[in-house]
């Protein structure tokens, strides 16, 4: 019969604050799994280390350049037609601003992965908060686009233009305010955790060194899952199901169908990029709540999955301009005119570079009587 194992607890002393800090430095992600009762190794495998130190800097640099140029072009094109912008285009303008905010934090992510966080607490709080603000504003703006299309197509709501634009601007301002308020936990509790050995790097994380901070972390996670993802996704699904059903009933107005198609594509790309991250984060939350059996193996898998899925989500910031370019007829026309004015390219060269860009589509959009990004 196996004899029980006894430990001389007097010979082992722990500083609990140091223990919390050691356990908090789990991965390079801002979402850090913390185990209360399972002591797992924090050493990363060679593949994940190579991914963070070699692939991520190159990929994030490319995303930074594409996202910066693409979203600035979107803002310039939409700003040129500020007085004739539709409600959907106003939402897309703010969506491009949110994506630019996400683009700005990519260099910080690259630097942290290479040398750790060396930029102090203020920038640590700012960068983590901007990450959350971007996601909240993006999801809420896409939900507003879905509601706007639903009201315009299913219920044929066409309000007086000035009153409608005023309500759109108020809605966008409210979304930005909500995004800031939802990111307050990050502004209050994010901090730089210094390493306790030469193998670790300083990390910018959501501090969980006491019970109050841990509760704030759980509240932030709950808000992230529900207000930032689940509820907006349900709103989008409900609205677009109604829109598609109405368009299938009335086989008319192909221009309106194209507008809805691009809106659905933008929403779909957002969900494809961010859904894996939210699924993994939700599993991590369940593990933290001990709703699932915790193990070092599961924690290791979650650490790798969080890093990979967060990369996919961050890549989203450069995809919307590409989508507008290849799926939006009027946007292509505006982009072509802008590039021609800048001396970069004209419709003919763009059609040669992209065979799918038919000159007919460019001329068709130029003859349109109303501006539409789609």
From Swiss-Prot:
Principal cellular location given in the protein's record: membrane
Assigned protein family: Belongs to the G-protein coupled receptor 1 family.
Cell compartment(s), UniProt: Cell membrane
Protein name (database record): C-X-C chemokine receptor type 5
Function: Cytokine receptor that binds to B-lymphocyte chemoattractant (BLC). Involved in B-cell migration into B-cell follicles of spleen and Peyer patches but not into those of mesenteric or peripheral lymph nodes.
Protein source organism: Rattus norvegicus
Annotated disulfide bonds: 124-204
Membrane topology summary: Multi-pass membrane protein
Glycosylation sites: 28, 198
Extracellular compartment segments: 1-57, 112-126, 191-221, 283-306
The entry's keywords: B-cell activation, Cell membrane, Disulfide bond, G-protein coupled receptor, Glycoprotein, Membrane, Receptor, Transducer, Transmembrane, Transmembrane helix
Gene3D superfamilies hit by this protein: Rhodopsin 7-helix transmembrane proteins (1.20.1070.10)
Topological domain spans for side Cytoplasmic: 79-90, 148-169, 243-261, 328-374
Keyword Membrane in record: yes
Lineage, top ranks: Eukaryota, Metazoa, Chordata, Craniata, Vertebrata
Transmembrane parts of this sequence: 58-78, 91-111, 127-147, 170-190, 222-242, 262-282, 307-327
InterPro entries on file: CCR1-9-like, Chemokine_CXCR5, GPCR_Rhodpsn, GPCR_Rhodpsn_7TM
Gene Ontology BP terms: B cell activation; calcium-mediated signaling; cell chemotaxis; immune response; leukocyte chemotaxis; lymph node development; positive regulation of cytokinesis; positive regulation of cytosolic calcium ion concentration
A single GO cellular-component term on record: external side of plasma membrane
Tissue: Expressed in neuronal and lymphatic tissue.
MF term (GO), any: C-C chemokine binding
UniProt xrefs under Pfam families: 7tm_1 (PF00001)
Keyword Disulfide bond assigned: yes
């Amino acid at each position: 019969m196996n004899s029980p194992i006894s430990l001389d607890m007097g010979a082992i002393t722990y500083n609990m604050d140091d223990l919390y800090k050691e356990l908090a430095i789990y991965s390079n992600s801002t979402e850090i799994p913390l185990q209360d009762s399972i002591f797992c190794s924090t050493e990363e495998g060679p593949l994940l280390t190579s991914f963070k130190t070699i692939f991520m800097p190159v990929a994030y640099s490319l995303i930074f350049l594409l996202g910066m140029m693409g979203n600035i072009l979107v803002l310039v094109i939409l700003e040129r037609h500020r007085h004739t912008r539709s409600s959907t285009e106003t939402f897309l303008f703010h969506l491009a601003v949110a994506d630019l905010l996400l683009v700005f934090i990519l260099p910080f992510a690259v630097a942290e992965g290479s040398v750790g966080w060396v930029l102090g607490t203020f920038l640590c709080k700012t960068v983590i908060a901007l990450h959350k603000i971007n996601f909240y504003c993006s999801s809420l703006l896409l939900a507003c686009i879905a509601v706007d299309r639903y009201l315009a197509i299913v219920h044929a709501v066409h309000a007086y233009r000035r009153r409608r634009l005023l309500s759109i601007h108020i809605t966008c301002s409210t979304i930005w305010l909500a995004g800031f308020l939802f990111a307050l936990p990050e502004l209050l509790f994010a901090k730089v955790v210094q390493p306790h050995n030469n193998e670790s790097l300083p990390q910018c994380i959501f501090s969980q060194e006491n019970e109050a901070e841990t509760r704030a972390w759980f509240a932030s996670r709950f808000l992230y899952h529900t207000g930032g993802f689940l509820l907006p996704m349900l709103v989008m699904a409900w609205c677009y199901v109604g829109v598609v059903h109405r368009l299938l009933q009335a086989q008319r107005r192909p221009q309106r169908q194209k507008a809805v198609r691009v809106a659905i594509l933008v929403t779909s790309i957002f969900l494809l990029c961010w859904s894996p991250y939210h699924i993994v984060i939700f599993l991590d939350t369940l593990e933290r709540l001990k709703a699932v059996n915790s193990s070092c193996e599961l924690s290791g898998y979650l650490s790798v999955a969080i890093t990979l899925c967060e990369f996919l989500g961050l890549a989203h910031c450069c995809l919307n301009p590409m989508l507008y370019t290849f799926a939006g007829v009027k946007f292509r026309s505006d982009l072509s005119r802008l590039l021609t004015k800048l001396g970069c390219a004209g419709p003919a060269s763009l059609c040669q570079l992209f065979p799918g860009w038919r000159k007919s589509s460019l001329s068709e959009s130029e003859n349109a009587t109303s501006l539409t990004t789609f």
